[in-house]
């Protein structure tokens, strides 16, 4: 296990400590990410293509037409041979050998968790997703893992589409700090430290939309604080963001929200 921050950044060792010394409590959660694959090594003839949608619906009828090119994804399945390799490597998985004991997102299980929780399932679906228009890097959704790189590669090579697999980066697990969100106001300002706002994963949530929604509210209220205006709070009856934030600050979390 290695200490680290965001991609290609060092760990922020003392950031949590600088906040908890003011009485704010912190805990740990975990998440994971899958292997990144070189598209030039994939046998797409052994996969099923999934075309992107071109029928776009927006909230406004006067929006500009969407110009972003849609890219296709592909699907395939694991098999018993790949499961056997994964099972044999479980003792080297931090998620199963005791190195990582935090709670992770319920609906994004690792491939290790899938084969342990559902031993009767002969296969699990995988989604191969492009990382962008101008890269050969593909994201293998459904194969989040903390197993050693050689085990991940060996298991994937048992799948026909990946028999000549070349990867950019293996999957890995992450354990991170978060702060109990009941210590926040509905504006996402901390109760203990005036003018300190928190948004996203640090509040115990998981997901891009959840983080983005909190960021909007925290940013608006930080601006309002600077200019002495009235707090901006969305109610449960007004927006999904209102439901999200009310859940966080009144109920707290015991797993990634």
Give a label for each model feature:
Residues 1-38, 159-160, 164, 217-230:
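Glycine-rich loop(s) and the adjacent beta-strand/alpha-helix scaffold that form part
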Residues 5-13, 145, 212-213, 234-238:
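Short, conserved loop/turn and helix-capping segments at secondary-structure boundaries
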Residues 17-153, 241, 250-257:
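An anion/pyrophosphate-binding glycine-rich loop and adjacent beta-alpha core
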Residues 19, 210-214, 247:
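Acidic helix/loop or adjacent segment enriched in Glu/Asp that either coordinates divalent metal
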Residues 29, 96-104, 162-170, 229-234:
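Flexible, glycine/charged-enriched surface loops at secondary-structure junctions
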Residues 139-205, 232-246:
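A glycine-rich dinucleotide-binding beta-alpha-beta segment and adjacent secondary-structure elements
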Residues 195-224:
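Conserved mid-domain beta->alpha element of the FAD-binding
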Residues 216, 222, 228-257:
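Non-catalytic terminal regions with compositionally biased, polar/charged low complexity
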């Amino acid at each position: 296990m290695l200490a680290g921050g965001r991609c290609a950044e060092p760990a922020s060792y003392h950031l949590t400590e600088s906040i908890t010394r003011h009485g704010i409590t912190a805990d740990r959660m975990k998440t994971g990410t899958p292997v990144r694959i070189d598209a030039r090594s994939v046998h797409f003839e052994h996969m099923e293509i999934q075309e992107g949608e071109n029928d776009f619906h927006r909230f406004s009828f006067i929006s500009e037409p969407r110009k972003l090119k849609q890219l296709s994804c592909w699907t395939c399945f694991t098999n018993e041979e790949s499961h056997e390799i994964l099972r044999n490597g479980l003792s080297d998985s931090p998620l199963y050998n005791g190195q990582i004991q935090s709670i992770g997102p319920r609906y994004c299980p690792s491939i290790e968790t899938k084969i342990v929780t559902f031993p009767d399932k002969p296969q699990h679906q995988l989604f191969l997703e492009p990382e962008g228009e101008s890269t050969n890097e593909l994201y293998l959704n459904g194969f989040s893992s903390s197993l050693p790189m050689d085990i991940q590669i060996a298991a994937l090579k048992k799948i026909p589409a990946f028999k000549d697999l070349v990867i950019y980066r293996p999957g890995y697990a992450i354990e991170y700090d978060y702060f109990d969100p009941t210590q926040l106001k509905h504006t996402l300002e901390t109760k203990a430290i005036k003018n300190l706002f928190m948004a996203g994963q640090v509040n115990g949530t998981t997901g891009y939309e959840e983080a983005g929604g909190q960021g909007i509210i925290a940013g608006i209220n930080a601006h309002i604080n600077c200019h002495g205006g009235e707090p901006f709070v969305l109610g449960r009856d007004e927006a999904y963001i209102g439901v999200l934030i009310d859940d966080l600050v009144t109920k707290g979390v015991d797993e990634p929200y």
